[in-house]
Amino acid sequence: MEPSPLSPSGAALPLPLSLAPPPLPLPAAAVVHVSFPEVTSALLESLNQQRLQGQLCDVSIRVQGREFRAHRAVLAASSPYFHDQVLLKGMTSISLPSVMDPGAFETVLASAYTGRLSMAAADIVNFLTVGSVLQMWHIVDKCTELLREGRASATTTTITPAAATSATVPGAGVPSGSGATVVPATVGSVRSHASSRASENQSPSSSNYFSPRESTDFSSSSQEAFPASAVGSGERRGGGPVFPAPVVGSGGATSGKLLLEADELCHDGGDERGPVVPGAGLRRPTYAPPSIMPQKHWVYVKRGGNSPAPAPLVPQDPDLEEDEEEDLVLTCEDDEDEELGGGSRVPEAGGREATLSISDVRTLTEPPDKGEEQVNFCESSNDFGSYDGGGPGAGLDDSGGPTPSSYAPSHPPRPLLPLDMQGNQILVFPSSSSSSSSSSSSQAPGQPPGNQAEHGAVTLGGTSSGALGMPGGPGGTPGGTGSGDGNKIFLCHCGKAFSHKSMRDRHVNMHLNLRPFDCPVCNKKFKMKHHLTEHMKTHTGLKPYECGVCAKKFMWRDSFMRHRGHCERRHRLVGGGGGGGPGPGGPTGPTLPLKRESPGAGGGSGDEASGATPQSSRRVWSPPSVHKVEMGFGGGGGTN
C-alpha cells in the first residue's frame, strides 16, 4: 500500500477522488414515494388556458347557436353524457338541447376544468337543468340543496327568547336571551347531505329537484326537540331519502352571488348544529319555480296499524325517534325497489315499527294541511270486512296483503288495498265466504287450508262497494270500472302523472327535446323509436299494407285505412245496383278476389252476359245506372 502523500509542512494530504471508497448501495427493497399535490391543479389550469386560447381542442359543443371548444378527454371524464357522446359514438360536434342556457353551460364547462362554480341566485334553475342533461350529479345535488334552502328561508320565523331553546337543536349553543332569528329545527333541515344514486348513468328525470319537507307546517315540529346525534348521520331511515341541511351563508347573501366548490359533495359530520340565520335581515330571495318544475306534487306515505296516540317525545335513543314529517317521501331511484320488495320499516315515535309498502303510497296535489283529512285513493269501503267474516281489515297486514300467521281484526275499519306491479288494486277475500267469491281469478299460494285467500285485479273507483266492483253494491260486478288516477304515482315536473316509470322517463325526454334515435341513412333524429321505424320505410320503399279489393299497396297505415273505407263503400254501391246481386247479407268487398278491368270488358258473348255472377258484375267501376246499361247491352247480344 502506497503511503499517503505529505505536504511540505509534513501534514498528510487528502486522497484523490478516484481513491475514495465507493458509497454504500441502497437496499433493493427500498422504494421512495414522492408526491406532487400541486401538479393536479396546475394541470387542469394549464388545460383551461389551452381551452380559452383554442389550443388542442378536439370537440365542439353547440348550445342555441353558440359554439364552445373543449377537450374530449376532459369532457368524457367529467360528464357521463359526454362520455357516451365522444367515446361510444365518436362525435366531434355535439348539439345540446335548446332547453339549456348557453351562459349556464359555459360556466359549468369552466367548472369541469377549475372545480369552481359561480352562479347567481336567480339562475340556479338553469344550472340545475344543465347538470341534469349532462348527468353531472354533484351540480344537481348542490343546486337542489340551494333551492330547498332558498324556499326554507322564506318560512323562517322570529321566536321569543323563552322558546329559543325548545325550537333549536340541543347543543347548538344559541344563548337563550339572544333573541336571534332561528330556522325551525326539523329533521329535513338539519340532516347532512348524503347523495345516493343507482348508477352514474341514471336518467335526469329521476333527480329529486325538490323536497316535500319545505311545504309542510313547521308549527308542530317547532315544539319537539331532537338530539344532535339523531341527525346528520347520513343514513336512510324508513326508506325515505335523506335531505341535506340548508346552511344559510352570511358572506354571500349580500352580494347576490353564490360561490360553490364543485368537489364538495357532502358535509363533514363534525359539529351538527341547527342552522341560525346570522343577522336580522339577511335572507335569500324567495324562489318562484317555473311551470315545468314541480308544484308541490309529492307522494304521501300513510302509516298502517291501529296504534294509540303517541306519548310526547322525550330525548331517548336517536334511532327510535321520528318526526311526523317522515310520512312525506319521494318514490324514485332505488327506493322503488325497496318498496316493491316487501316494504320497509319506519320506526315510529313510540319505538314501534310500521311496515310501508307500495299500497301505502298515494298522490297529493297539495301539501298536507294540519287538521284537514287527506283523501286516500287506495282505501276500500267500510263494508270490506264482510268478505272475511271477521272484523274490518281482518287478514290484512299493514301493507294490505294477507298474512298467514295473523287473521285477527286489529286494524281500522278502512284498510288499504294492495297494488300489483301494473298498479291495479287487489281485492283479498276468503274463497268460502260467499258464492260470488268463488268466481275470483286465482288462489294465493301458501295460505292456511281452512282460510284460503283469492284476489282479483280491479280498477280504482270510489269508496263505495259498487264503485269497487263488489257484488254487494248496486249493479256492482267484479272488475268494476273507475278512474285510474290513483295508480299514477310517477310524477313529472309539469304536473302530469304516469303509472310506469318508463312512461314518465319518455315524457321527460319530450320536455328536454332529446332525440336519441338516429336514422343511419339521412342522420335525421327522432324522439320515439316507432317514429324512426316508420321513417325507415321511406328509404326501403316497403309498402306493407295491401288493399284486398283493388290490390293497391300503401306505405302508411292511415292512407291504407282511408283508401279501404272509400273502396269498400264504392263496391257496395256498385254491387247493390245490379239485378240479382247479393243482399246486405252477402259477401263484402274485401273477401272477393276481384281485379280492376276496363269498362269495355263488360260486353261479350251472350253466354258471358247471361251467366254472369254477382262477382263478375262488380268488376266495372261505374255508377249503378251506367252499370245497368252495360248489362242490357250484354243481355241483348246473348239473345240474338
Curated annotation (Swiss-Prot):
Bias (Acidic residues) ranges = 318-327
Q: Where is the composition biased (Gly residues)?
A: 469-482, 574-588
The name on file for this protein is Zinc finger and BTB domain-containing protein 22
User: What organism is the protein native to?
Assistant: Canis lupus familiaris (Dog)
Annotated Gene Ontology cellular component terms: nucleus
Q: Which SUPFAM superfamilies match?
A: beta-beta-alpha zinc fingers, POZ domain
Query: Which residues are in the BTB domain?
Result: 57-121
Q: What does this protein do?
A: May be involved in transcriptional regulation.
Residues bearing the modification Phosphoserine: 203
Key words of the record: DNA-binding, Metal-binding, Nucleus, Phosphoprotein, Repeat, Transcription, Transcription regulation, Zinc, Zinc-finger
Question: Which ranges are annotated Polar residues under compositional bias?
Answer: 192-210
Database matches in Pfam families: BTB, zf-C2H2
Instruction: State where the protein is found.
Output: Nucleus
Does Transcription regulation show up as a keyword for this record?
yes
Q: What is its main location?
A: nucleus
- Per the UniProt record, which residue ranges are transmembrane? none
Q: Which InterPro entries match?
A: BTB/POZ_dom, SKP1/BTB/POZ_sf, Znf_C2H2_sf, Znf_C2H2_type, ZnFinger_BTB_dom_contain
Q: Where are the zinc fingers (C2H2-type)?
A: 490-511, 517-539, 545-571
Write the gene name. Answer: ZBTB22
